[in-house]
Design a protein with these regions (language model features):
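Cys/His-enriched microdomains
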Residues: 31-34, 47
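Cysteine-rich micro-motifs
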Residues: 42-56
Length: 917
C-alpha cells in the first residue's frame, strides 16, 4: 500500500476523514496548495500550505506566554490533566518491548506490542498524556545546523483508545489541541493551519492532521482506524488516537529565538559557554536572520551546506568567514548539548556505547562530541555537561539523578578509550594527508567502523574540507533497527489444537499419557498434551521416551509442541493412539537448576557491576550454562569472585521462587521493563518468575521452588565475546560440585608432584618456580659462553660460495632453539659474510632458524631463506627480517634432503635475486 494512493483515497472524501466540528465552529476552510497539491484547513485564504512558509515566528512569537522547555511541559500537562487525561511517566528510551527496535522512536511506541507480525495497542490509562523522550539517529549531521533537528527529543503523547471507557475521537482531539494552542499559549486561531496526511504501519493505518503555526509543525494527530490494505480493509475494534507534539517546538514557538536549541538547552548552553569561556550573543540579530533564511532555503541546498552558508552571507552583507566565525561555535554548542542529553537518557535506561546494535549510534555521537571539543580546544568533561542536563530536567525526569554515577562511569570509560586511540588516528590522518586523495563517504564509513575515526577528527586535522552531508545518515542506517530472530521449525503444523502444557500445571510431573494428534515425516509427534519442555528462551529441551522410543528433540511452533523420535519403526505410532511418555528426570533437574542460576547470576552481575547490565542472551543445557551480559569491559578476577559470592549468598538464603501469570500491561506496571531480560514477550499474558524480589523476569522456563535447591553456582570462565558483551560460563547443582571435586583432585595431584600438601601447594609452587627460574638463568649464561667458543668453529666449517658469501647449516633433535638463536647471533657478528641456518626438531614440527651477516644481506635476506626452507619442509613460509627469520614445517622426511641440497637452494635464491636486480 502506497502512502500517496492512500492519501488520495482519504482526500477524495474530506468530510468523512478530515473534517471535524472545530472547523465549522471556527471557520476553517479546506484549501489546496498550489505548490505541492496538498490539502489543508485554515481560516484565512493561503495559496500554499505551511510546508512552504518561512519561520516568521523568529523574533516575533505569536504567543502570549514565553515558556522554556520545562515550563512548557508544566503548562501542557496541567491543561490535559484538567481535561481528564492521566499523566504517566515516560517509558525507557531503550525499547525492550519491541524486538524490531533498539530505541523508542515515538511516543506511541510505548503502547505498541508486536504479535504475529501485527501491532497491538496496549494503553494503560485512557486517555493519557506522556512526556516521552525519543531517540532517532537519521539526522545526526543536521543537529546544530537547522535549529530544529535532534537525536533525542521529547514527543508529547496524547493517546486515547476511542472505543474504551473515557475514550474520544477526532472532534474532541482537535478541539483539545486547538484549545491548548489558543487558550494556554495564546495563539490566535487564524495562525493555526491543519494539513491532511496519512499514517500506516504493520497492517494498520489511518488519516492524520498535522498542525502548523507560522511555518513550524507543532504536532500531528494520527487517527489509527483501519487494518488491512487499501482494497480490503476493516475498522479496528479499538480505534487509536496518537497525537504526537514536539515539546522542543512548542517551547520554541513561544520564545521566537533563533533556534529551538536556545529554549531546549538554554541553561545548559549558557553554563557551557561560561565553562569554556566563549562569548556568543544568543539573541543577536545576525543569528535570527541567519536561521530564518537557513530554514527557508535548507531543502534546496541540503547537499551543499557550505554553498548555502555562502549565499546567506551574501544576503546578509557579511563575509562567509565572519558568518562562520559566529555560527560555527553556536552550532557546535548545540550539537554537544543534544548529543550529551541523548547519551544521558540512553545510558540511564541501560544501553551502552559499543560497536554493535543500538550502542553503535551512541558511540558515534559520543566520539563526535569528543572530536568537536578537541577541534575547538574546549577543555570540558562530558560528565560535567551531563550534570547540567540532570539539573535542568530534574522536575520532569527526576530518575536521571539516580543513574548519574553509572552514566559518569560509562562516559569516562568511553572517553578514555577514544583518547588512547588518538595516536593511531593521528598516524592514519598523516598518511591520508600524504596521499592527497579525497576519501569517499564509503571510505569514511569504513574508517569509522575499523578505526573509530570520525570525519570531525579528519576535518580538525585537515584531511577533509567538509563532512559529507549524508555520512552520519548512512552510518546510522546500518544500525537503526534489527530483525527479530526467527526460530527454526520442522514444518508448518496446521489443523491441530494447541498442546496442553503439563509442565506448567505440575512442574514435578515426569510421566504422562497423551493422544497423538499428528505424525510428521514419520519421526515427529504432535500430542494433545505433554510434560516434555521444548527448546525455548535459551533452555534446551527435555529428553526421554514415548512408548520406549527415545525423544531426542522437542520444539514449539506457536502453541504446538513437536517431539522428535529416534529410529521409530513405521508401525510404532498412529494418529489418535494413546501413548505413554517419560521425561528424563536427571536432565530436567540439571537444566532447571542451571536456569534458576542464570536469573540469580544476572541480578548478581547487575548489583556488582552497574545498572547497565542486562541479559544479552543465555543458554542452559544439562551439563553447562552460559549467560551473556551487557558490560563495557572484560571482568577482573575480583569482579568474577564478587558475582559468584553474591549469587551463592542468594542460594544459601533459600529464597522462594514464585511464578505467576499477569496481563502484560499489569506486569510492566508492577515490575518495569526490567522483566524483559530474555527479550519481548509476544503474548497478552506474561509469566513472571520472581526470586523473592532479588530478580524478577518474564520467563517461560522451568525453575526450582527455592534457591537452596540449586546447591552451588560455580563460574568456570569469563570472556568478552564482543564489544559491550561479556560471557559467563558456569555450572550449578551437582555439576558444580563435580567441578569443584575435579579441581580438588587436580590440586592434590599437583601437590603430590611437588612433594607437598594441598595446604602448602602455593608455597611449594613458588619455591619450585624460583628454582626453575634460577636454572633458566644459569642455562642462558652457559649458552652464551658456549656459543662464543662455537661461533669461531662454525665460521671455520662454513662453505664458501661466490662473492665471499659463506653458509653453514645444521640439524638437532635434542637441544632447544634458544641455543641456536644465541649461536646464530654470535656467528654473524663474528663473520659478516656468513649465512647460518639451523633445523631443530620440536615434537612433530621442524623449526627453521636463519641468520644472515651484514655483508651477505646485500645480496640475500634471512626472510627469503626461511621461507624457501620452510616450503621444502611442508610449511607455508617463514617470517622475519633481513637479518633474522624463522619458519618451519611438519615433513620430517625432508630434513636430510634440505641439508644435502641447501647449497643448491642458496645458489638458486642468489640467481633469482641477481636476475631481479
Amino acid at each position: 500500500m502506497e502512502k500517496e494512493s492512500l492519501l488520495s483515497l482519504f482526500s477524495s472524501n474530506p468530510d468523512k476523514y478530515y473534517k471535524v466540528s472545530l472547523f465549522d465552529e471556527k471557520g476553517f476552510k479546506r484549501q489546496n496548495c498550489r505548490l505541492c497539491g496538498k490539502f489543508f484547513w485554515s481560516i484565512n485564504y493561503k495559496e500554499s500550505c505551511p510546508e512552504h512558509e518561512n519561520y516568521s515566528f523568529i523574533d516575533d512569537p505569536p504567543t502570549s506566554k514565553r515558556l522554556d522547555f520545562v515550563n512548557t511541559w508544566k503548562e501542557l500537562s496541567s491543561f490535559f490533566r484538567k481535561n481528564d487525561h492521566e499523566l504517566i511517566q515516560r517509558y525507557p528510551v531503550v525499547c525492550r518491548w519491541r524486538e524490531d527496535l533498539y530505541f523508542t522512536i515515538a511516543s506511541i511506541v510505548d503502547f505498541q506490542r508486536l504479535m504475529n507480525g501485527k501491532i497491538v495497542f496496549e494503553i494503560p490509562k485512557n486517555p493519557l498524556i506522556v512526556p516521552q523522550m525519543c531517540l532517532r539517529f537519521n539526522d545526526i549531521e543536521n543537529v546544530g545546523l537547522t535549529g530544529r533537528h535532534y537525536t533525542s527529543f521529547c514527543m508529547i503523547g496524547q493517546t486515547c483508545n476511542a472505543d474504551a471507557p473515557g475514550g474520544y475521537w477526532k472532534d474532541r482531539c482537535i478541539e483539545l489541541d486547538h484549545a491548548f494552542l489558543k487558550n494556554v499559549l495564546g495563539i490566535q486561531s487564524e495562525e493555526i493551519t491543519f494539513v491532511e496526511d496519512v499514517w500506516m504501519g504493520a497492517g494498520a493505518f489511518g488519516n492524520s492532521l498535522e498542525y502548523y503555526v507560522r511555518g513550524l509543525e507543532l504536532g500531528n494527530a494520527v487517527f489509527t482506524e483501519f487494518e488491512g490494505d487499501q482494497s480490503n480493509y476493516r475498522t479496528l475494534d479499538s480505534r487509536i488516537i496518537d497525537m504526537g507534539a514536539g515539546l522542543e517546538r512548542l517551547s520554541w514557538i513561544t520564545m521566537g529565538t533563533p533556534t529551538s536549541y536556545d529554549t531546549t538547552f538554554g541553561p545548559v548552553i549558557n553554563k557551557l559557554k561560561n565553562m569554556i569561556n566563549i562569548d556568543i550573543d544568543l539573541n543577536s540579530e545576525l543569528l535570527s536572520q541567519y536561521f530564518r533564511i537557513f530554514a527557508e532555503k535548507y531543502s534546496k541546498y541540503q547537499n551543499d551546506i557550505k554553498l548555502l552558508k555562502i549565499n546567506i552571507s551574501k544576503e546578509l552583507g557579511v563575509s562567509y568567514e565572519t558568518l562562520e566565525k559566529t555560527i560555527l561555535p553556536y552550532e557546535t554548542l548545540s550539537v554537544i548539548a543534544d548529543h550529551t542529553r541523548t547519551l544521558l537518557f540512553a545510558i540511564s535506561d541501560g544501553s551502552l556505547p559499543s560497536n554493535v546494535g543500538g550502542g553503535y549510534n551512541l558511540r558515534i555521537i559520543l566520539r563526535r562530541t569528543l572530536a568537536l571539543l578537541a577541534r575547538f580546544g574546549w577543555n570540558v568533561n562530558l560528565e560535567d555537561i551531563i550534570d547540567l542536563h540532570i539539573e535542568q530536567l530534574k522536575s520532569m525526569y527526576p530518575e536521571l539523578k539516580e543513574h548519574s554515577n553509572d552514566v559518569r562511569t560509562i562516559i569516562q570509560i568511553e572517553s578514555g578509550r577514544y583518547g588512547s586511540s588518538k595516536e593511531r588516528m593521528y598516524s592514519i590522518a598523516k598518511s591520508m594527508l600524504s596521499s592527497k586523495k579525497s576519501p569517499s563517504v564509503e571510505h569514511l564509513i569504513k574508517m569509522y567502523e575499523s578505526d573509530g575515526i570520525t570525519p570531525d577528527f579528519l576535518l580538525e586535522n585537515g584531511v577533509i574540507e567538509n563532512i559529507p552531508p549524508d555520512f552520519y545518515l548512512k552510518l546510522a542506517e546500518l544500525h537503526t533497527s534489527h530483525e527479530p530472530k526467527q526460530a527454526a521449525v520442522v514444518e508448518t503444523v496446521t489443523g491441530v489444537r494447541p498442546t496442553k502444557l503439563l509442565y506448567y500445571e505440575n512442574a514435578s510431573i515426569r510421566e504422562f499419557d497423551a493422544r497423538i494428534l499428528k505424525i510428521l515425516n514419520g519421526k515427529y509427534l504432535v500430542l494433545d498434551q505433554t510434560a516434555f519442555y521444548p527448546r525455548g528462551g535459551g533452555q534446551e529441551p527435555d529428553f526421554g521416551y514415548i512408548e520406549g522410543v527415545k525423544i531426542t528433540d522437542v520444539v514449539k511452533q506457536n502453541d504446538i509442541v513437536i517431539h522428535k523420535l529416534e529410529n521409530a519403526s513405521k508401525d510404532s505410532f498412529s494418529e489418535d493412539k494413546i501413548v505413554h511418555g517419560i521425561v528424563d528426570n536427571s536432565r530436567r533437574v540439571a537444566i532447571t537448576k542451571n536456569h534458576s542460576a542464570t536469573h540469580i547470576l544476572n541480578s548478581s552481575a547487575r548489583n556488582i557491576l552497574g545498572s547497565w547490565v542486562w541479559q544479552n542472551s543465555a543458554f542452559k543445557e544439562e551439563n553447562y550454562a552460559r549467560l551473556d551480559i551487557t558490560h563495557h569491559s572484560a571482568l577482573t578476577r575480583e569482579e568474577i569472585r564478587h558475582i559468584e559470592n553474591t549469587a551463592n549468598d542468594v542460594v544459601q538464603r533459600n529464597l522462594p521462587i514464585l511464578i505467576n501469570v499477569f496481563e502484560r500491561s499489569d506486569a510492566e506496571n508492577r515490575y518495569s521493563f526490567r522483566i524483559y531480560q530474555g527479550g519481548a514477550v509476544p503474548s497478552n499474558n506474561v509469566r513472571i518468575v520472581n526470586i523473592d524480589g532479588w530478580d524478577i523476569e518474564a520467563c517461560g522456563g522451568t525453575h526450582v521452588n527455592k534457591t537452596g535447591e540449586i546447591g552451588l553456582i560455580k563460574i568456570l570462565k569469563s570472556e568478552r565475546i564482543q564489544d559491550g558483551v561479556v560471557r559467563l560460563e558456569f555450572v550449578a547443582g551437582t555439576n558444580a560440585v563435580r567441578y569443584v571435586q575435579s579441581q580438588d583432585s587436580q590440586l592434590l595431584h599437583i601437590a603430590q608432584s611437588l612433594g607437598s600438601s594441598k595446604e602448602k601447594v602455593v608455597e611449594s609452587f613458588d619455591k619450585t618456580s624460583g628454582e626453575n627460574e634460577l636454572m633458566k638463568r644459569k642455562f642462558r649464561t652457559l649458552v652464551n659462553k658456549f656459543s662464543d667458543s662455537m661461533a669461531t668453529i662454525v665460521s671455520q666449517k662454513a662453505t664458501t660460495l661466490r662473492s665471499g658469501l659463506k653458509f653453514f647449516i645444521t640439524y638437532d633433535d635434542e637441544i632447544g632453539d634458544d641455543y641456536y638463536i644465541a649461536l646464530g647471533e654470535k656467528t654473524i657478528d663474528n663473520d659478516p659474510f656468513l649465512v647460518y641456518v639451523a633445523l631443530i626438531q620440536d615434537q612433530e614440527r621442524i623449526k627453521v632458524i636463519a641468520f644472515v651477516g651484514i655483508e651477505s644481506r646485500k645480496i640475500i635476506k634471512a626472510s627469503r631463506i626461511a621461507k624457501e626452507v620452510s616450503l621444502k619442509l611442508g610449511g607455508t613460509g617463514g617470517g622475519g627480517t633481513d637479518k633474522f627469520a624463522q619458519g618451519g614445517g611438519t615433513d620430517k622426511s625432508k630434513v636430510q634432503e634440505c641439508l644435502k641440497n641447501f647449497e643448491n637452494l642458496l645458489t638458486s635464491i642468489l640467481d633469482s635475486s641477481e636476475k631481479n636486480d
